[in-house]
Amino acid sequence: MLLIRELNSVEAAAVSMNTIQEYAEGSRLGVPVLVSMDSVHGLSYVSGATVTGHNLALAATRDEDLVTRLAEIARDEHIAIGVRMTLSPEADIASEPRWGRVMETFGEDPDLVTKMVTAQVVAFQNGRDGLNTGAIVACMKHFPGAGPQMEGKDTSPIISSAETLQIHLKPYYAALEVNIASIMPYYSVPLELDMENSAIGSKATLQDLLRDEMGFEGIIQTDWGMIWAIQEGRGTMMGEEVSDEEAILIGITESRVDGIGGESIRLIDQMEELTNAGKIDEDILTAAATRIVKAKFELGVFENPYCDVEYAVQFVGNEEHQAVNLEAARKAMTLLKNDGILPLKQNEKQTILVCGPRAGDMDSLVGGWSSAQEGLTIADAVAAYAGENATVIYESDNVESIAELAKDADIIIVSVGEPSYQHDPPWGYDTLEITGSQQEILEAAKASGKPMVTVVTGGRPYILTWCDENTNAILEAYYPGSQGGIAIAETLFGLNNPTGKTPLQFPRDMDSVRNQEGDVSFDLENPLYDYGWGLSYGE
């Protein structure tokens, strides 16, 4: 299996896939490649494709049918460019708000996560009965649950009891009922399961729990670069610290891993040597190869591994797909506060100051795990929707300029939030508060005495207590996707009535975050906005 990332056009993507398959066809056995993509929110690594909001935004819609439609679009766009495996859906339950990958989850409610993830699996795999020629392989992650992290820091899972573990396994049990084809283990293993081994070498996790107890017969696929990561981090395998590849390879085969992400070609000669020396059981390797080849046959890639480049160019990211994407972004908009200032009037003779670095940044709408995408930023969209009688001014991050411009503004829209990222959040794990220059921008705008609207983008539940006490309205947009700028502007000007509901609790302060249990949902003390909060116009 091969992982592809960051392709700058649909045509380049389709041509690349065909080139890969041509190379494979000319190899000794001519076995086609099963190409995967780390596409956790649409065909996100292809510029010009349908790049949806992250799952946290989709969770705010509470719309299972809409999530299904978006997953079907993603499936068909993957197939159109020749990619037949997605490293999603994300089944983690966001019980620790500091975790950097909260944005990829459907929030902290195990029931909502289970419902939405199951809908994605069925859509990706074109039905409930396993793979077929109209499917892509869904690789569900990160088993057995990566949402609980010690102080939010990746690779430190803290599931504390057998009862809590069962809660975090709930989406996996549901996915097994609809024949999920592939599952990816997490980097580390919760101590409740295994105190000695890295995830990909944990027999207790993968063989005893996933295979034997839960009955999973599909592909266990490691994340990319995990063998290297274990070597560099002096991880543990089979209860001993190891850095040599031999011990790691023996350990992962004994734990019944099928696919080694990103390192199979580099390690194939060593795998053969270890097998010939009797250190790796050939029957285990045969079983792993059988699972992967079986999936390729079920998908039909042996019969036709190639894609139609011309069709891909006209199909991927088409207007109909983007219309559904925009519908989802609209439904994700979550109005946290409104003292009556919203909706703003269109075509009003007024000066609107839009400020904050996130307002001019497309990546802050799309979020991580993405290539560069085109679209309207928040500032562009506000200018487009304000009307010809309005004057819209944008200032990114010069606090002195913002303070001066605010004096002549009638309305100030301040955009705050974390910039795009993948694993480690730019604001770190120690705070969820708006800090630094963005807080200075808020205070400069507030000093003008003019009406203020705060627009929040990002992937975690930020502490918005200052904004709640000092601004007139707060619109939470999450990472809404490539159509997010339009959805935000439409909501601000009343063309979209916000109906989104928070998919997790928003903390009031960091003390409540530090005092909560990282593996338990709904346990923040006195949250600023509770789970399920969200206003609409007229309320």
Q: Residue locations for each model-derived region?
A:
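Glycoside hydrolase catalytic-domain context in secreted enzymes
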Residues: 1-539
